[in-house]
A protein has these predicted regions:
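Membrane-interface "cap" regions at the ends of multi-pass membrane proteins
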Residues: 1-27, 56-61, 65-78, 82-87, ...
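Membrane-embedded translocation segments of transport machinery
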Residues: 2-6, 169, 173-321, 325, ...
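Inter-helical loop and helix-membrane interface segments of multi-pass membrane transporters/permeases
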Residues: 3-4, 32-36, 66-91, 104-165, ...
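Select transmembrane alpha-helical segments in multipass membrane proteins
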Residues: 5-16, 41-44, 83-97, 146-152, ...
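Transmembrane helix-boundary motif of multi-pass solute transporters/channels
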Residues: 11-48, 236-242, 252-256, 260-261, ...
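Loop-to-transmembrane helix boundary motifs in multi-pass membrane proteins
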Residues: 11-13, 19, 146-147, 261-267, ...
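Hydrophobic alpha-helical segments of multi-pass membrane transport proteins
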Residues: 320-326, 347-365, 381-415
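A generic transmembrane alpha-helix motif of multi-pass inner-membrane proteins
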Residues: 373, 377-401, 423-451
Length: 451
């Protein structure tokens, strides 16, 4: 059977960027940037993004494009006879399932809040306790959380069942275009608020005092981690899109475009958050408390708050759902390639599997709220720890070693594939950096995540 392919270069870039752009761009990056020195952090982040993230992204894409296969089979096509690199492919799929076991729940929160702003659950004059109560009530209701999680899962597999070009590519183009329009509109609105100058100063102006206070080592570490994790590398989520892409452009050119689009969304998120928080004197935060308590409080303090709140959660729904459908495509592709299933069968079976597998995360906030797993973490944090702190860095290290070592695919074969087409070409003199320095940087991230 002939391998499907993207209908356009734009489609590939938007689908891949949609996979990278996620909740962390909004609820983690801006806060970390502000606390860890503003402009200093942003510059360090960009340095590590291009020094670490882009090279590993080209490697994952190269394995996919050269093999025209996804996880497992991509390794099998390229590895030397008798070697076992392909075993990592199975861990990639496990990582994708684990990621969806909690990401679908959090994505359900986004669409739930979109409807709460539309239906009048949030109204002007609500105080912080009432706003926090809405979030607490949602978490305490397994029925409500299961419903919205199921909406995300079913919608995601419906998109994938329609095919690559008719489903994933078409929907991603529309969502990503809408996402960019929404984030620009929200940022412009925030920049017109009275607290915009103070918010921008905190966010973007280099702050030596914050760097010293946080510790230079901690600032560098935070920039490395954020730059590495933002591209969702190490679990074949990008490899599958490499298997669908053309050979007309170099992989470095495409990786740079994906990374810049991801960075644009992260930076713009801060332009939404900080001017608004400084205008209304509300303490900034990160994580779920920022999105589901701090920002609703901000929106309800401003004129037309329900409208702006609805727009923000529509943006967040698109940001999270774009990641969901991208990872679903990887899972679906694995089942089609391994078991010979049709797209429709792969979508139906995986829809049922992910629905069932996502329930522990839902129940972890209510029925199983006293359940504590690795290091006392709840269900969601345990699943996130396994993916973010273990599978992503280990997987990235394996892709790196496969592409640069003589026991794997080999650096020359990787470089030939990466430089195929028009655009930015990687020079051969980078080989020592890829072989000796980049593995050390990834190892540092892995160790930091485990201690």
């Amino acid at each position: 059977m002939q391998r499907e392919s993207f209908g356009s270069r734009l489609g590939f870039i938007l689908v891949s960027a949609g996979c990278a752009i996620g909740i962390g761009n909004v609820w983690r990056f801006p806060y970390i940037a502000g606390v860890y020195g503003g402009g200093f952090f942003v510059l360090l982040y960009l340095f590590f993004l291009f020094a670490m993230g882009v090279p590993v992204l080209t490697m994952e894409l190269a394995v996919g494009r050269a093999s025209r296969q996804g996880a497992v089979k991509g390794y099998q096509v390229l590895e030397k006879p008798g070697s076992h690199w392909h075993i990592h492919g199975y861990f990639c799929i496990i990582g994708c399932y684990l990621l969806m076991m909690y990401y679908t729940t959090v994505s359900g929160w986004m669409i739930s809040y979109l409807f709460k702003f539309l239906n009048g659950t949030f109204v002007a004059g609500m105080d912080a306790d009432a706003i926090a109560g809405v979030f607490g009530s949602m978490l305490a209701s397994p029925g409500e959380m299961t419903f919205w999680m199921a909406v995300i899962v079913i919608a995601g597999f419906l998109v994938c069942s329609r095919g690559l070009q008719s489903g994933l590519e078409r929907i991603s183009k529309v969502m990503m275009a809408a996402l960019l329009v929404l984030i620009i509109a929200l940022a412009v609105h925030s920049l017109l608020l009275s607290g915009a100058p103070s918010g921008l100063a905190f966010y973007l102006i280099p702050n030596v005092e914050n760097v010293v206070s946080a510790g230079v080592g901690n600032v560098i570490s935070a920039a490395m981690n954020r730059a590495f994790f933002t591209l969702s590398l190490g679990i074949a989520a990008m490899e599958i899109f490499g298997s669908y892409m053309s050979r007309e452009n170099t992989l470095t050119s495409e990786a740079v475009r994906i990374s810049l689009l991801d960075t644009f969304v992260a930076l713009m998120s801060g332009l939404i958050i900080f001017p608004a928080c400084f205008t209304y004197g509300i303490q900034t935060d990160q994580g779920p408390s920022l999105v589901f308590m701090t920002l609703p409080n901000v929106f309800l303090n401003m004129s037309g708050g329900r409208f702006w709140g609805a727009l923000f959660f529509l943006f967040m729904t698109f940001a999270s759902f774009s990641t969901v459908i991208a990872v679903f495509e990887n899972i679906s592709s694995f089942c089609r390639d391994t078991f010979g299933w049709s797209r429709k069968k792969a979508a139906i079976v995986n829809c049922l599997v992910v629905l069932a597998a996502s329930l522990p995360c839902v129940f972890g906030y209510n029925i199983w709220q006293n359940l504590h797993l690795i290091g006392g973490r709840d269900v969601l944090d345990t699943e996130d720890f396994l993916v973010s702190n273990l599978l992503l860095p280990v997987g990235s290290m394996i892709y790196l070693l496969f592409c640069v070592s003589k026991w794997g695919w080999g650096f020359d074969a990787y470089l030939k594939e990466a430089n195929c087409g028009d655009g930015i070409k990687l020079p051969k003199w980078l080989k020592p950096y890829f072989q000796y320095i980049l593995p050390v940087l990834i190892l540092i991230i892995l160790i930091q995540g485990l201690i």
